[in-house]
């Protein structure tokens, strides 16, 4: 009888732990500053680009401002927010022979690692996917309206944000070089379905799974 009570207590404790982990993953944002800047620079670049003609007649000033915001967004997403929000990181390395290698790192799942929250993962991927699509719309609208002076800026926006999207998809897919076969399904699942919290792990400098190309 005593052993049965002990077993019941252990089962209840185990379920309680699972409920705590589930509640944590569904908790509110744990990295508010990183989440804010993940969206701030890219949204600010879009808003500035759209409203430039309304608030300023200086093409050069608008061009420099939008390009600065795009550059800050590229750096912060590549070096900070991806590592903090979803535990992914990509970068380039030059070896001793002078050859360039692209490194794609993803935090390994371990019992000691803490998963990122669903809200952070969802914000990260949606912001990463939707904003380049908006710049693609700007590309066609600029082309068809013959505002060719803005075309270089729009191409820069597409290039910088698509580079981060491409790099993080490769991180997520384990550095799979055949990116064409997996991109479409990944994007559709990210946009239209709830992100799986177990897929996104808190970053760290240890236990990283590294893929080189």
From Swiss-Prot:
<dbReference type="InterPro" id="IPR008564">
    <property type="entry name" value="TVP23-like"/>
</dbReference>
<feature type="transmembrane region" description="Helical">
    <location>
        <begin position="123"/>
        <end position="143"/>
    </location>
</feature>
<protein>
    <recommendedName>
        <fullName>Golgi apparatus membrane protein TVP23 homolog A</fullName>
    </recommendedName>
</protein>
<keyword id="KW-0472">Membrane</keyword>
<feature type="transmembrane region" description="Helical">
    <location>
        <begin position="150"/>
        <end position="170"/>
    </location>
</feature>
<feature type="transmembrane region" description="Helical">
    <location>
        <begin position="54"/>
        <end position="74"/>
    </location>
</feature>
<dbReference type="Pfam" id="PF05832">
    <property type="entry name" value="DUF846"/>
</dbReference>
<keyword id="KW-0812">Transmembrane</keyword>
<keyword id="KW-1133">Transmembrane helix</keyword>
<feature type="transmembrane region" description="Helical">
    <location>
        <begin position="32"/>
        <end position="52"/>
    </location>
</feature>
<dbReference type="GO" id="GO:0000139">
    <property type="term" value="C:Golgi membrane"/>
</dbReference>
<comment type="similarity">
    <text>Belongs to the TVP23 family.</text>
</comment>
<dbReference type="GO" id="GO:0009306">
    <property type="term" value="P:protein secretion"/>
</dbReference>
<dbReference type="GO" id="GO:0016192">
    <property type="term" value="P:vesicle-mediated transport"/>
</dbReference>
């Amino acid at each position: 009888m005593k052993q049965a009570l002990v077993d019941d207590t252990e089962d209840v404790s185990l379920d309680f732990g699972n409920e705590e982990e589930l509640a944590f993953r569904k908790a509110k944002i744990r990295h508010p500053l990183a989440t804010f800047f993940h969206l701030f620079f890219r949204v600010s670049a879009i808003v500035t680009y759209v409203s430039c003609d309304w608030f300023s007649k200086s093409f050069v000033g608008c061009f420099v401002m939008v390009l600065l915001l795009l550059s800050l967004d590229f750096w912060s997403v590549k070096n900070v927010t991806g590592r903090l929000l979803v535990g992914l990181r990509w970068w380039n390395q030059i070896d001793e022979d002078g050859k360039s290698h692209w490194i794609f790192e993803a935090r390994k799942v371990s019992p000691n690692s803490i998963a990122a929250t669903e809200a952070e993962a969802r914000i990260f991927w949606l912001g990463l996917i939707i904003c380049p699509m908006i710049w693609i719309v700007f590309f066609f609208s600029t082309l068809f309206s013959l505002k060719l002076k803005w075309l270089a800026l729009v191409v820069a926006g597409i290039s910088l944000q698509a580079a981060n999207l491409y790099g993080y998809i490769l991180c997520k897919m384990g550095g799979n070089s055949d990116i064409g076969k997996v991109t479409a399904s990944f994007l559709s699942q990210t946009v239209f379905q709830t992100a799986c919290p177990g897929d996104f792990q808190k970053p760290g400098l240890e236990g990283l799974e590294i893929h080189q190309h």
